[in-house]
Amino acid sequence: MNAKGELPMSETLLDRLETAVVDDREHGVFRCRRDIFTDPAFFDLEMTHIFESNWVYLAHESQIPERNDYFTTWIGRKPVVITRDKAGELHAIINACAHRGAMLCRRKHGNKGTFTCPFHGWTFGNTGKLLKVKDGKTADYPTTFDTEGSHDLTRIAHFESYRGFLFGCLNPEAEPLSAYLGETKRIIDQIAHQAPNGIEVVRGNSSYIYDGNWKLQIENGADGYHVSSVHWNYSATMGRRNYEADGVPTVDANGWSRSVGGVYGFENGHMMLWTRLLNPEVRPIYAHREELARRLGEEHAAPIVEQTRNLCLYPNVYLMDQFSTQIRVIRPISVDKTEVTIYCFAPKGESAAERALRIRQYEDFFNVSGMGTPDDLEEFRACQAAYAGNSQLWNDLSRGATRWIDGPDENARALGLKPTLSGERSEDEGLFVRQHEHWVRVLRAALLKDGSGGGQPASSVKQIRSVA
């Protein structure tokens, strides 16, 4: 650092990670550096060590319901296909031909017992086994060709389900999924317990790309502070809707900021925003509160019916149970481009009337045509554009700092949760500090293990101004 408080261009990635997040309670400073959203060097590290070395969400079992069904997705930069074989077993396989690497399945989903590569005609079973090589008998392959599965498709190192939610990991040395999810399993249980037979993904989805870093969406899904300003149009429209003339009833968005709520930070970067509903009777689940109480007990049923929850399972999915019910999957494409795919989920066996209400509520806020999603995407774009200017180094994350609690608050204890941090209001920002600290730990450990010391210089700025 020079006399002007500037960090030179020769500053390494490891140097920058040391100062990427400030969690200084003594001086009341809580912030993160904006270049963590803009630097391609950080993005490359994220893809390798966060997305391609840890557990990520893949799909829900209900999206591959029948024998020979398949569903395509991604783990970081790696294309993946999930298949259900003729015996009903699920498999997760790298979606790349073992011959020359062309993507094998090029549709989002379908039903096939075998896959033939369009490039050179190799055929594989949906378990990944190589079945046939085009013109193989006259090709003069060496004797070692296709022995002991050498040319089968590559299986994902770890592939597990929790309550029907499917996760995969490319790292053979990763901890078990149950340990990675940790305390968040209790919230996933709340979602899965909404019907005796669990939940299912409703047919159809929306997919869109925004011009911004993936962490903008990860933050925003648990940001209660932005709701009243960014989504004022949604709140105003719902306030003017004529419910007596068959308008779709909605969760009270006008009362969001004044409702009881809070935030939680968990191990491994997971986090959650919750609120207590002011009008829980408008949601389809409310009609089942007595059945839930009988099946689960009142202490477990009450929060399912009376609370909203936006649960971030780091690094790539939100399970949202609020204005409606949604699975939001985040896929980074580049440092400043992100794909989001959203699905509506619902309890299995719910009535046609309840399903219709759920979907109408979903359409009001979500989808690219909804009143919420486009507003968020504009803010992501605006943030990314301004970050590139480097006129200010820091994002302030100190809202609610005097109320943050290490460990569980009263609501968390009632739920049996043990977060590492609790915020007493839904607008508190401490959970972002914890999540970005996890980001730093993962990348720093990777650089130190690599032995390079993060010697790559900063790539996105010539000089970085240190702002006290």
Regions found by a protein language model. Give the residues of each.
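Rieske [2Fe-2S] iron-sulfur-binding domain
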Residues: 1, 63-186
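N-terminal low-complexity, Ser/Thr- and acidic-residue-enriched intrinsically disordered segments
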Residues: 2-11, 17, 33, 68
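Short, contiguous pre-domain boundary segments
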Residues: 14-34, 198
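Non-catalytic accessory segments flanking enzyme active sites
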Residues: 25, 30-81
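Generic structural signal for secondary-structure transition and capping sites
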Residues: 51-55, 102, 226
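Short Pro/Gly-enriched beta-strand edge/turn motifs at strand-loop
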Residues: 52-65, 138-143, 308-314
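C-terminal catalytic domain of Rieske-type non-heme iron oxygenases
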Residues: 89, 157-468
